[in-house]
Amino acid sequence: MAQLRRGHLTFRDVAIEFSQEEWKCLDPVQKALYRDVMLENYRNLVSLGICLPDLSIISMMKQRTEPWTVENEMKVAKNPDRWEGIKDINTGRSCAVRSKAGNKPITNQLGLTFQLPLPELEIFQGEGKIYECNQVQKFISHSSSVSPLQRIYSGVKTHIFNKHRNDFVDFPLLSQEQKAHIRRKPYECNEQGKVFRVSSSLPNHQVIHTADKPNRCHECGKTVRDKSGLAEHWRIRTGEKPYKCKECGKLFNRIAYLARHEKVHTGESPYKCNECGKVFSRITYLVRHQKIHTREKPHKCNKCGKVYSSSSYLAQHWRIHTGEKLYKCNKCGKEFSGHSSLTTHLLIHTGEKPYKCKECDKAFRHKFSLTVHQRNHNGEKPYKCHECGKVFTQVSHLARHQKIHTGEKPYKCNECGKVFTQNSHLANHQRIHTGEKPYKCHVCGKVFRHSSWFVQHQRSVHERVLTN
Protein backbone atom coordinates (compact mmCIF):
# COMPACT_ATOMS: atom_id res chain seq x y z
CA MET A 1 0.00 0.00 0.00
CA ALA A 2 1.32 3.38 -0.95
CA GLN A 3 2.65 5.43 1.92
CA LEU A 4 0.62 8.58 2.55
CA ARG A 5 2.07 11.93 3.41
CA ARG A 6 0.38 15.17 4.29
CA GLY A 7 1.08 18.59 2.83
CA HIS A 8 -0.50 21.96 2.10
CA LEU A 9 -2.52 22.65 -1.03
CA THR A 10 -1.88 25.97 -2.76
CA PHE A 11 -3.68 27.98 -5.39
CA ARG A 12 -0.90 27.00 -7.74
CA ASP A 13 -1.87 23.33 -7.37
CA VAL A 14 -5.19 24.11 -9.04
CA ALA A 15 -3.83 26.66 -11.52
CA ILE A 16 -2.92 26.21 -15.17
CA GLU A 17 0.14 28.21 -16.24
CA PHE A 18 1.16 29.58 -19.63
CA SER A 19 4.32 31.25 -20.82
CA GLN A 20 3.96 34.48 -22.79
CA GLU A 21 4.69 32.52 -25.98
CA GLU A 22 2.00 29.92 -25.19
CA TRP A 23 -0.51 32.64 -24.33
CA LYS A 24 0.00 34.37 -27.68
CA CYS A 25 -0.83 31.08 -29.48
CA LEU A 26 -4.31 30.90 -27.93
CA ASP A 27 -7.35 32.22 -29.76
CA PRO A 28 -9.99 34.33 -27.89
CA VAL A 29 -12.22 31.34 -27.12
CA GLN A 30 -9.31 29.39 -25.63
CA LYS A 31 -8.29 32.40 -23.51
CA ALA A 32 -11.87 32.75 -22.27
CA LEU A 33 -11.96 29.05 -21.39
CA TYR A 34 -8.67 29.46 -19.48
CA ARG A 35 -10.13 32.35 -17.48
CA ASP A 36 -13.26 30.37 -16.65
CA VAL A 37 -11.28 27.33 -15.44
CA MET A 38 -8.95 29.46 -13.28
CA LEU A 39 -11.77 31.51 -11.77
CA GLU A 40 -13.83 28.39 -11.08
CA ASN A 41 -10.95 26.77 -9.20
CA TYR A 42 -10.37 30.00 -7.25
CA ARG A 43 -14.07 30.23 -6.31
CA ASN A 44 -14.10 26.59 -5.22
CA LEU A 45 -11.30 27.33 -2.75
CA VAL A 46 -13.09 30.42 -1.48
CA SER A 47 -16.35 28.45 -1.09
CA LEU A 48 -14.57 26.25 1.46
CA GLY A 49 -14.28 29.30 3.72
CA ILE A 50 -10.53 29.68 3.13
CA CYS A 51 -8.86 33.08 3.29
CA LEU A 52 -6.76 33.35 0.13
CA PRO A 53 -4.13 36.02 -0.56
CA ASP A 54 -5.20 38.90 -2.75
CA LEU A 55 -3.92 37.49 -6.03
CA SER A 56 -3.72 40.17 -8.67
CA ILE A 57 -3.92 37.48 -11.36
CA ILE A 58 -7.53 36.87 -10.29
CA SER A 59 -8.27 40.60 -10.51
CA MET A 60 -6.71 40.68 -13.98
CA MET A 61 -8.85 37.77 -15.16
CA LYS A 62 -12.01 39.35 -13.75
CA GLN A 63 -11.13 42.51 -15.68
CA ARG A 64 -10.35 40.34 -18.76
CA THR A 65 -6.75 41.59 -19.01
CA GLU A 66 -3.84 39.39 -20.10
CA PRO A 67 -2.42 37.07 -17.42
CA TRP A 68 -0.04 34.27 -18.42
CA THR A 69 1.64 32.95 -15.29
CA VAL A 70 1.11 32.78 -11.55
CA GLU A 71 4.86 32.66 -10.82
CA ASN A 72 5.00 36.30 -9.73
CA GLU A 73 1.94 35.80 -7.55
CA MET A 74 3.66 33.01 -5.70
CA LYS A 75 6.72 35.18 -5.06
CA VAL A 76 4.53 37.83 -3.47
CA ALA A 77 2.57 35.27 -1.48
CA LYS A 78 5.57 33.55 0.12
CA ASN A 79 6.14 33.97 3.84
CA PRO A 80 9.91 33.90 4.61
CA ASP A 81 9.32 33.47 8.35
CA ARG A 82 7.42 30.25 8.03
CA TRP A 83 8.50 26.62 7.72
CA GLU A 84 6.48 24.23 5.65
CA GLY A 85 6.70 20.49 5.76
CA ILE A 86 5.13 17.16 5.08
CA LYS A 87 4.41 14.70 7.82
CA ASP A 88 4.57 10.93 7.61
CA ILE A 89 1.26 9.92 9.20
CA ASN A 90 2.55 6.42 9.94
CA THR A 91 5.69 7.46 11.87
CA GLY A 92 4.69 10.97 12.93
CA ARG A 93 8.05 12.35 11.75
CA SER A 94 8.19 15.62 9.80
CA CYS A 95 10.67 16.81 7.22
CA ALA A 96 11.00 20.38 5.94
CA VAL A 97 10.29 21.09 2.32
CA ARG A 98 11.33 24.75 2.54
CA SER A 99 13.62 26.52 5.01
CA LYS A 100 13.69 30.14 6.19
CA ALA A 101 17.02 30.69 4.49
CA GLY A 102 16.39 29.15 1.09
CA ASN A 103 12.70 30.06 0.79
CA LYS A 104 12.43 28.11 -2.49
CA PRO A 105 9.46 26.00 -3.49
CA ILE A 106 10.06 22.25 -3.47
CA THR A 107 8.36 20.06 -6.05
CA ASN A 108 7.86 16.50 -4.84
CA GLN A 109 8.06 13.29 -6.89
CA LEU A 110 4.44 13.64 -8.00
CA GLY A 111 4.97 17.12 -9.41
CA LEU A 112 2.90 18.96 -6.78
CA THR A 113 4.52 22.19 -5.57
CA PHE A 114 4.33 23.11 -1.87
CA GLN A 115 4.12 26.89 -1.49
CA LEU A 116 1.93 29.09 0.69
CA PRO A 117 0.03 27.07 3.34
CA LEU A 118 -3.72 27.64 3.34
CA PRO A 119 -5.56 27.37 6.70
CA GLU A 120 -7.83 24.34 7.17
CA LEU A 121 -6.92 23.02 3.71
CA GLU A 122 -4.70 19.95 3.77
CA ILE A 123 -4.38 16.97 1.49
CA PHE A 124 -3.23 13.42 2.00
CA GLN A 125 -0.76 12.66 -0.71
CA GLY A 126 -0.02 9.18 -2.09
CA GLU A 127 1.56 7.68 -5.16
CA GLY A 128 -1.76 6.96 -6.88
CA LYS A 129 -4.29 9.42 -8.28
CA ILE A 130 -6.54 9.93 -5.24
CA TYR A 131 -5.89 12.59 -2.60
CA GLU A 132 -8.37 12.80 0.26
CA CYS A 133 -8.91 14.33 3.71
CA ASN A 134 -11.68 15.46 6.03
CA GLN A 135 -12.01 18.91 4.49
CA VAL A 136 -11.07 18.44 0.84
CA GLN A 137 -10.80 15.60 -1.63
CA LYS A 138 -8.79 16.16 -4.75
CA PHE A 139 -9.23 13.86 -7.72
CA ILE A 140 -6.68 14.53 -10.45
CA SER A 141 -5.10 12.62 -13.29
CA HIS A 142 -1.62 14.10 -13.13
CA SER A 143 0.94 13.84 -15.92
CA SER A 144 4.01 16.00 -16.29
CA SER A 145 4.02 15.29 -20.03
CA VAL A 146 0.68 17.05 -20.58
CA SER A 147 1.04 20.70 -21.51
CA PRO A 148 -1.32 23.34 -20.04
CA LEU A 149 -3.03 23.80 -23.41
CA GLN A 150 -3.54 20.05 -23.84
CA ARG A 151 -4.91 19.92 -20.30
CA ILE A 152 -7.81 22.17 -21.28
CA TYR A 153 -8.94 20.06 -24.23
CA SER A 154 -8.16 16.58 -22.91
CA GLY A 155 -10.23 17.16 -19.79
CA VAL A 156 -7.27 16.52 -17.46
CA LYS A 157 -8.40 19.23 -15.04
CA THR A 158 -8.42 19.59 -11.29
CA HIS A 159 -11.74 19.15 -9.52
CA ILE A 160 -12.06 20.21 -5.90
CA PHE A 161 -14.99 18.87 -3.98
CA ASN A 162 -15.87 18.79 -0.29
CA LYS A 163 -18.67 17.95 2.09
CA HIS A 164 -20.76 20.79 0.69
CA ARG A 165 -20.59 19.84 -3.02
CA ASN A 166 -23.23 17.57 -4.59
CA ASP A 167 -21.39 17.04 -7.90
CA PHE A 168 -19.59 13.95 -6.63
CA VAL A 169 -22.26 12.50 -4.34
CA ASP A 170 -21.85 9.10 -6.01
CA PHE A 171 -18.05 9.12 -5.85
CA PRO A 172 -16.95 5.59 -4.78
CA LEU A 173 -14.65 6.74 -1.94
CA LEU A 174 -17.43 8.51 -0.05
CA SER A 175 -19.15 6.70 2.81
CA GLN A 176 -22.94 6.68 3.15
CA GLU A 177 -22.61 9.16 6.04
CA GLN A 178 -20.58 11.54 3.87
CA LYS A 179 -23.10 11.25 1.02
CA ALA A 180 -25.93 12.03 3.44
CA HIS A 181 -24.00 15.10 4.65
CA ILE A 182 -23.54 16.27 1.06
CA ARG A 183 -27.26 15.99 0.33
CA ARG A 184 -28.26 18.08 3.36
CA LYS A 185 -28.97 21.77 2.80
CA PRO A 186 -29.18 23.35 6.28
CA TYR A 187 -29.03 27.02 5.26
CA GLU A 188 -32.44 28.41 4.19
CA CYS A 189 -33.42 31.83 2.85
CA ASN A 190 -36.34 33.23 4.87
CA GLU A 191 -37.51 35.37 1.96
CA GLN A 192 -37.74 32.80 -0.83
CA GLY A 193 -37.29 29.45 0.90
CA LYS A 194 -34.27 28.54 -1.20
CA VAL A 195 -31.80 26.26 0.63
CA PHE A 196 -28.00 26.00 0.45
CA ARG A 197 -25.36 23.52 1.57
CA VAL A 198 -22.63 26.10 2.25
CA SER A 199 -23.12 28.80 4.89
CA SER A 200 -21.30 31.40 2.76
CA SER A 201 -23.75 30.84 -0.12
CA LEU A 202 -26.72 32.08 1.94
CA PRO A 203 -25.51 35.68 2.51
CA ASN A 204 -24.38 35.81 -1.13
CA HIS A 205 -27.93 34.90 -2.17
CA GLN A 206 -29.61 37.24 0.35
CA VAL A 207 -28.00 40.24 -1.34
CA ILE A 208 -30.80 40.08 -3.92
CA HIS A 209 -33.40 40.67 -1.17
CA THR A 210 -31.67 43.61 0.57
CA ALA A 211 -32.51 47.27 0.05
CA ASP A 212 -29.04 47.99 -1.33
CA LYS A 213 -29.26 46.63 -4.87
CA PRO A 214 -26.57 48.24 -7.04
CA ASN A 215 -26.49 45.45 -9.64
CA ARG A 216 -30.03 45.75 -10.95
CA CYS A 217 -31.14 45.29 -14.55
CA HIS A 218 -32.86 48.51 -15.63
CA GLU A 219 -35.00 46.57 -18.13
CA CYS A 220 -36.65 43.92 -15.94
CA GLY A 221 -35.58 44.93 -12.42
CA LYS A 222 -33.80 41.64 -11.69
CA THR A 223 -31.00 41.96 -9.12
CA VAL A 224 -27.78 39.93 -9.27
CA ARG A 225 -24.85 39.59 -6.89
CA ASP A 226 -22.08 41.26 -8.89
CA LYS A 227 -21.27 43.11 -12.11
CA SER A 228 -20.20 39.93 -13.92
CA GLY A 229 -23.59 38.39 -13.12
CA LEU A 230 -25.31 41.52 -14.42
CA ALA A 231 -23.28 41.36 -17.65
CA GLU A 232 -24.24 37.71 -18.07
CA HIS A 233 -27.90 38.51 -17.42
CA TRP A 234 -27.77 41.35 -19.95
CA ARG A 235 -26.40 38.98 -22.61
CA ILE A 236 -29.44 36.77 -22.03
CA ARG A 237 -31.83 39.70 -22.53
CA THR A 238 -30.07 41.12 -25.59
CA GLY A 239 -29.46 37.72 -27.14
CA GLU A 240 -25.72 38.36 -27.44
CA LYS A 241 -23.81 35.14 -28.02
CA PRO A 242 -20.06 35.80 -28.36
CA TYR A 243 -18.90 32.16 -28.18
CA LYS A 244 -19.06 30.21 -31.46
CA CYS A 245 -18.65 26.50 -32.13
CA LYS A 246 -16.03 25.92 -34.84
CA GLU A 247 -17.70 22.68 -35.95
CA CYS A 248 -21.27 23.81 -36.63
CA GLY A 249 -21.23 27.58 -36.06
CA LYS A 250 -23.73 27.49 -33.17
CA LEU A 251 -23.47 30.48 -30.83
CA PHE A 252 -23.57 30.59 -27.02
CA ASN A 253 -23.74 33.32 -24.39
CA ARG A 254 -21.43 31.45 -21.98
CA ILE A 255 -18.09 29.76 -22.55
CA ALA A 256 -19.22 26.89 -20.32
CA TYR A 257 -22.19 26.25 -22.63
CA LEU A 258 -19.84 26.14 -25.63
CA ALA A 259 -17.55 23.64 -23.90
CA ARG A 260 -20.55 21.49 -23.00
CA HIS A 261 -21.90 21.68 -26.57
CA GLU A 262 -18.58 20.62 -28.10
CA LYS A 263 -19.00 17.21 -26.46
CA VAL A 264 -21.85 16.62 -28.93
CA HIS A 265 -19.30 16.63 -31.76
CA THR A 266 -16.67 14.60 -29.92
CA GLY A 267 -19.24 12.07 -28.71
CA GLU A 268 -17.80 12.22 -25.20
CA SER A 269 -20.26 10.72 -22.70
CA PRO A 270 -18.22 9.39 -19.78
CA TYR A 271 -21.03 9.09 -17.21
CA LYS A 272 -23.19 5.95 -17.40
CA CYS A 273 -26.36 5.04 -15.50
CA ASN A 274 -26.03 1.62 -13.86
CA GLU A 275 -29.79 1.09 -14.00
CA CYS A 276 -30.55 1.55 -17.70
CA GLY A 277 -27.12 2.03 -19.33
CA LYS A 278 -27.86 5.55 -20.59
CA VAL A 279 -24.75 7.72 -20.90
CA PHE A 280 -24.30 11.44 -20.25
CA SER A 281 -21.74 14.12 -21.01
CA ARG A 282 -21.97 15.66 -17.53
CA ILE A 283 -22.17 14.10 -14.08
CA THR A 284 -24.93 16.55 -13.11
CA TYR A 285 -27.07 15.13 -15.93
CA LEU A 286 -26.44 11.62 -14.64
CA VAL A 287 -27.39 12.58 -11.07
CA ARG A 288 -30.56 14.26 -12.34
CA HIS A 289 -31.41 11.25 -14.53
CA GLN A 290 -30.93 8.75 -11.67
CA LYS A 291 -33.72 10.45 -9.76
CA ILE A 292 -36.09 8.99 -12.38
CA HIS A 293 -35.23 5.53 -11.11
CA THR A 294 -35.23 6.46 -7.41
CA ARG A 295 -38.26 8.78 -7.79
CA GLU A 296 -36.37 11.22 -5.58
CA LYS A 297 -37.69 14.80 -5.60
CA PRO A 298 -35.91 16.65 -2.79
CA HIS A 299 -36.67 20.21 -3.95
CA LYS A 300 -40.03 21.48 -2.65
CA CYS A 301 -41.82 24.74 -3.40
CA ASN A 302 -42.71 26.50 -0.12
CA LYS A 303 -45.58 28.27 -1.85
CA CYS A 304 -47.63 25.38 -3.28
CA GLY A 305 -45.82 22.26 -2.07
CA LYS A 306 -44.93 20.97 -5.53
CA VAL A 307 -41.71 18.93 -5.59
CA TYR A 308 -38.95 18.67 -8.21
CA SER A 309 -35.93 16.49 -8.87
CA SER A 310 -33.53 19.42 -9.37
CA SER A 311 -33.08 22.94 -7.99
CA SER A 312 -33.11 24.41 -11.52
CA TYR A 313 -36.62 23.02 -12.11
CA LEU A 314 -37.74 24.49 -8.79
CA ALA A 315 -36.21 27.88 -9.69
CA GLN A 316 -38.09 27.88 -13.00
CA HIS A 317 -41.32 26.87 -11.25
CA TRP A 318 -40.86 29.67 -8.70
CA ARG A 319 -41.17 32.21 -11.50
CA ILE A 320 -44.79 31.10 -11.96
CA HIS A 321 -45.55 32.48 -8.48
CA THR A 322 -43.49 35.66 -8.91
CA GLY A 323 -44.67 36.29 -12.47
CA GLU A 324 -41.06 36.88 -13.49
CA LYS A 325 -40.43 36.41 -17.23
CA LEU A 326 -36.80 37.01 -18.16
CA TYR A 327 -36.80 35.74 -21.71
CA LYS A 328 -38.46 37.68 -24.54
CA CYS A 329 -39.05 36.64 -28.15
CA ASN A 330 -37.64 39.23 -30.56
CA LYS A 331 -40.12 38.13 -33.24
CA CYS A 332 -43.47 38.53 -31.49
CA GLY A 333 -42.61 39.99 -28.09
CA LYS A 334 -43.93 37.04 -26.10
CA GLU A 335 -42.14 36.55 -22.77
CA PHE A 336 -41.20 33.33 -21.00
CA SER A 337 -40.05 32.35 -17.51
CA GLY A 338 -37.53 29.78 -18.78
CA HIS A 339 -34.84 29.95 -21.48
CA SER A 340 -35.79 26.49 -22.77
CA SER A 341 -39.38 27.68 -23.24
CA LEU A 342 -38.14 30.59 -25.38
CA THR A 343 -35.93 28.26 -27.44
CA THR A 344 -38.91 25.96 -28.00
CA HIS A 345 -41.10 28.91 -28.99
CA LEU A 346 -38.58 30.29 -31.52
CA LEU A 347 -38.83 27.08 -33.55
CA ILE A 348 -42.46 28.02 -34.30
CA HIS A 349 -41.27 31.13 -36.15
CA THR A 350 -38.48 29.37 -38.03
CA GLY A 351 -40.46 26.21 -38.76
CA GLU A 352 -37.27 24.28 -38.09
CA LYS A 353 -37.54 20.58 -37.23
CA PRO A 354 -33.92 19.47 -36.86
CA TYR A 355 -34.55 16.05 -35.28
CA LYS A 356 -35.47 13.40 -37.85
CA CYS A 357 -36.50 9.79 -37.29
CA LYS A 358 -34.37 7.35 -39.31
CA GLU A 359 -37.16 4.78 -39.36
CA CYS A 360 -40.01 6.80 -40.86
CA ASP A 361 -38.41 10.19 -41.74
CA LYS A 362 -40.79 12.05 -39.42
CA ALA A 363 -39.19 15.27 -38.14
CA PHE A 364 -39.49 16.98 -34.75
CA ARG A 365 -38.62 20.33 -33.24
CA HIS A 366 -37.21 18.82 -30.07
CA LYS A 367 -34.83 15.97 -29.35
CA PHE A 368 -37.07 14.77 -26.54
CA SER A 369 -40.01 14.44 -28.95
CA LEU A 370 -37.85 12.32 -31.26
CA THR A 371 -36.74 10.12 -28.35
CA VAL A 372 -40.35 9.53 -27.31
CA HIS A 373 -41.38 8.86 -30.92
CA GLN A 374 -38.61 6.30 -31.43
CA ARG A 375 -40.05 4.26 -28.57
CA ASN A 376 -43.01 3.53 -30.86
CA HIS A 377 -40.58 1.75 -33.20
CA ASN A 378 -38.47 -0.10 -30.65
CA GLY A 379 -41.25 -0.80 -28.15
CA GLU A 380 -39.29 0.69 -25.24
CA LYS A 381 -41.39 1.58 -22.18
CA PRO A 382 -38.97 2.60 -19.41
CA TYR A 383 -41.50 3.96 -16.90
CA LYS A 384 -43.22 1.34 -14.73
CA CYS A 385 -46.07 1.70 -12.24
CA HIS A 386 -45.06 0.11 -8.92
CA GLU A 387 -48.71 -0.50 -8.03
CA CYS A 388 -49.89 -2.58 -11.00
CA GLY A 389 -46.77 -3.10 -13.13
CA LYS A 390 -48.10 -1.23 -16.17
CA VAL A 391 -45.36 0.38 -18.28
CA PHE A 392 -45.32 3.64 -20.24
CA THR A 393 -43.24 5.42 -22.86
CA GLN A 394 -43.34 8.79 -21.07
CA VAL A 395 -43.00 9.77 -17.42
CA SER A 396 -45.97 12.14 -17.80
CA HIS A 397 -48.14 9.19 -18.84
CA LEU A 398 -47.00 7.30 -15.75
CA ALA A 399 -47.79 10.27 -13.49
CA ARG A 400 -51.23 10.58 -15.08
CA HIS A 401 -51.88 6.84 -14.64
CA GLN A 402 -50.81 6.83 -10.97
CA LYS A 403 -53.68 9.17 -10.11
CA ILE A 404 -55.99 6.20 -10.74
CA HIS A 405 -54.42 4.43 -7.76
CA THR A 406 -54.24 7.48 -5.50
CA GLY A 407 -57.68 8.79 -6.44
CA GLU A 408 -56.21 12.27 -6.77
CA LYS A 409 -58.32 14.71 -8.79
CA PRO A 410 -56.66 18.12 -8.42
CA TYR A 411 -58.46 19.90 -11.29
CA LYS A 412 -61.86 21.34 -10.33
CA CYS A 413 -64.48 23.08 -12.47
CA ASN A 414 -65.45 26.46 -11.00
CA GLU A 415 -68.89 26.27 -12.62
CA CYS A 416 -70.22 22.94 -11.34
CA GLY A 417 -67.55 21.66 -8.95
CA LYS A 418 -66.74 18.52 -10.93
CA VAL A 419 -63.16 17.30 -10.45
CA PHE A 420 -60.72 15.67 -12.89
CA THR A 421 -57.40 13.83 -12.84
CA GLN A 422 -56.00 15.82 -15.78
CA ASN A 423 -56.04 19.47 -16.74
CA SER A 424 -56.89 18.57 -20.36
CA HIS A 425 -60.02 16.74 -19.17
CA LEU A 426 -61.07 19.84 -17.24
CA ALA A 427 -60.51 22.01 -20.34
CA ASN A 428 -62.67 19.67 -22.44
CA HIS A 429 -65.39 19.69 -19.78
CA GLN A 430 -65.46 23.49 -19.49
CA ARG A 431 -66.48 23.72 -23.16
CA ILE A 432 -69.88 22.38 -22.07
CA HIS A 433 -70.36 25.57 -20.03
CA THR A 434 -68.80 27.96 -22.55
CA GLY A 435 -70.28 26.34 -25.68
CA GLU A 436 -66.88 26.54 -27.38
CA LYS A 437 -66.39 24.24 -30.39
CA PRO A 438 -62.86 24.84 -31.69
CA TYR A 439 -62.61 21.95 -34.17
CA LYS A 440 -64.12 22.73 -37.58
CA CYS A 441 -64.43 20.39 -40.57
CA HIS A 442 -63.09 22.16 -43.67
CA VAL A 443 -65.25 19.94 -45.94
CA CYS A 444 -68.74 20.58 -44.55
CA GLY A 445 -68.13 23.29 -41.97
CA LYS A 446 -69.46 21.30 -39.01
CA VAL A 447 -67.86 22.18 -35.65
CA PHE A 448 -66.98 19.96 -32.70
CA ARG A 449 -66.19 20.34 -29.02
CA HIS A 450 -63.55 17.59 -28.89
CA SER A 451 -60.77 16.65 -31.30
CA SER A 452 -61.69 12.95 -31.05
CA TRP A 453 -65.23 13.71 -32.28
CA PHE A 454 -63.78 15.77 -35.14
CA VAL A 455 -61.44 12.93 -36.22
CA GLN A 456 -64.26 10.38 -35.98
CA HIS A 457 -66.49 12.61 -38.15
CA GLN A 458 -63.84 12.93 -40.86
CA ARG A 459 -63.24 9.18 -40.99
CA SER A 460 -66.90 8.19 -41.09
CA VAL A 461 -68.36 10.95 -43.31
CA HIS A 462 -65.58 12.34 -45.50
CA GLU A 463 -63.11 9.46 -45.74
CA ARG A 464 -63.45 9.17 -49.53
CA VAL A 465 -63.11 12.91 -50.06
CA LEU A 466 -60.01 13.06 -47.88
CA THR A 467 -58.32 10.06 -49.53
CA ASN A 468 -58.97 11.42 -53.04
Curated annotation (Swiss-Prot):
Gene Ontology biological process terms in this record: regulation of transcription by RNA polymerase II
Keywords, comma-separated and alphabetical: DNA-binding, Isopeptide bond, Metal-binding, Nucleus, Repeat, Transcription, Transcription regulation, Ubl conjugation, Zinc, Zinc-finger
InterPro entries to which the protein is assigned, alphabetical: KRAB (IPR001909), KRAB_dom_sf (IPR036051), Znf_C2H2_sf (IPR036236), Znf_C2H2_type (IPR013087)
GO cellular component labels: nucleus
Principal location: nucleus
C2H2-type zinc finger locations on the chain: 187-209, 215-237, 243-265, 271-293, 299-321, 327-349, 355-377, 383-405, 411-433, 439-462
UniProt GO molecular function: DNA-binding transcription factor activity, RNA polymerase II-specific; RNA polymerase II cis-regulatory region sequence-specific DNA binding; zinc ion binding
Cross-link (Glycyl lysine isopeptide (Lys-Gly) (interchain with G-Cter in SUMO2)): K75, K157, K179, K367
KRAB domain boundaries: 9-80
One Pfam family of this chain: zf-H2C2_2
Location of the protein in the cell: Nucleus
Similarity section: Belongs to the krueppel C2H2-type zinc-finger protein family.
Function of the protein: May be involved in transcriptional regulation.
Name of protein: Zinc finger protein 766
